[in-house]
Curated annotation (Swiss-Prot):
Keyword Metal-binding: no
Transit peptide limits: 1-50, 51-77
Stimuli inducing this protein: Down-regulated in response to mixed metal ion contamination (cadmium, copper, lead and zinc), but not in response to zinc ion contamination.
Gene (name only): PSBO
Protein name: Oxygen-evolving enhancer protein 1, chloroplastic
Organism per entry: Helianthus annuus (Common sunflower)
Any one of the GO CC terms: chloroplast thylakoid membrane
Length: 324
């Protein structure tokens, strides 16, 4: 019993000083100057100082982590860049535009009037730009037996989906009717979106060979939708429309009954589809010939060269043009 009490008393007796071996890296990290091979310090004071330094280091690390997270999320927090006028875009240098998203935006106008304030006559539409702001795909819902409807999608393509520099003749009749024919320009863009269930839908956003007619508040027409893949594209088995193998599938073990499915895979179909678009003029600036508005387009998606049934893709956005 006495031995136990003596041991407990010895353990509880405070130690005034201890000898600690010094390490150059530890001394440098915690601001302790080493003298010789040993350093003498008060146990309670140094432990308190050590704990304080650890707390400060944790605060600094936490602040650095939060700062880095803020920097990473800064682009999405700021949102889309401010929409600029055509002259403002032209006045910027390449480095001022690079990485800002401005190159993927259609210009806007300032000081214009509501509606289509353009005199009747024949014009040449230039700098025609179409910028999508929404992609929806008609597909069955996630729930069982749900009817097909247009569903919101997630864009999987980078900011390269805007059509620009499109041009063609535009005629304004005396009764206010508009007729526009697309002739040239960057009139197609490959886009891929993802449905809520995870399925990805590629399509070729385009207005090739568009002939649009109607009143300024609603004019539109049909256009050509080329095949997403060309005839020289080879699938993983080396089959193509104009090159590659004609047949790369062995006879099915079950005999007949799969000919139609095999035919779709073997014989590539690069036929073009048809789409429909409707424009609406929201504002115009007669002194500069600038016109802006909104549009809605419905077109088919990619068919994997005829192997899949196309889906309807609805594209909504804004447009800009100059009339000369």
């Amino acid at each position: 019993m006495a031995a136990s009490l003596q041991a407990a008393a010895t353990f509880m007796t405070p130690t005034s000083r201890v000898q600690l071996k010094s390490s150059p890296s530890i001394c440098k990290a915690f601001g302790i100057e080493s003298t010789g091979s040993k350093v003498s310090c008060s146990l309670q004071a140094d432990l308190k100082d050590f704990a304080q330094k650890c707390t400060d280091a944790a605060k600094i690390a936490g602040f650095a982590l939060a700062t880095s997270a803020l920097v990473v999320s800064g682009a999405s927090a700021e949102g889309s860049p401010k929409r600029l006028t055509y002259d403002e875009i032209q006045s910027k240098t390449y480095m001022e535009v690079k990485g800002t998203g401005t190159a993927n935006q259609c210009p806007t106008i300032e000081g214009g009037v509501n509606g289509f304030a353009v005199k009747p006559g024949k014009y040449n539409a230039q700098k025609f730009c179409l910028e999508p702001t929404s992609f929806t795909v008609k597909a069955e819902g996630i729930s069982k037996n749900s009817a097909p409807e247009f569903q919101k999608t997630k864009l999987m393509t980078r900011l390269t989906y805007t059509l620009d520099e499109i041009e063609g003749p535009l005629e304004v009749s005396s009764d206010g009717t508009i007729k526009f024919e697309e002739k040239d320009g960057i009139d197609y863009a490959a886009v891929t979106v993802q449905l809520p269930g995870g399925e990805r839908v590629p399509f070729l956003f385009t207005i090739k060979e568009l002939v649009a007619t109607g009143k300024p508040e609603s004019f539109g027409g049909n256009f050509l939708v080329p095949s997403y893949r060309g005839s020289s594209f080879l699938d993983p088995k080396g089959r193509g429309g104009s090159t590659g193998y004609d047949n790369a599938v062995a006879l099915p073990a079950g005999g007949r009954g799969d000919e139609e499915e095999l035919l779709k895979e073997n014989i590539k179909n690069t036929a073009a589809g048809k789409g429909e678009i409707t424009f609406s003029v929201t504002s115009s600036k007669p002194e500069t010939g600038e016109v802006i508005g909104v549009f809605e387009s419905i077109q088919p998606s990619d068919t994997d060269l005829g192997a899949k049934a196309p889906k309807d893709v609805k594209i909504q956005g804004v447009w800009y043009a100059q009339l000369w």
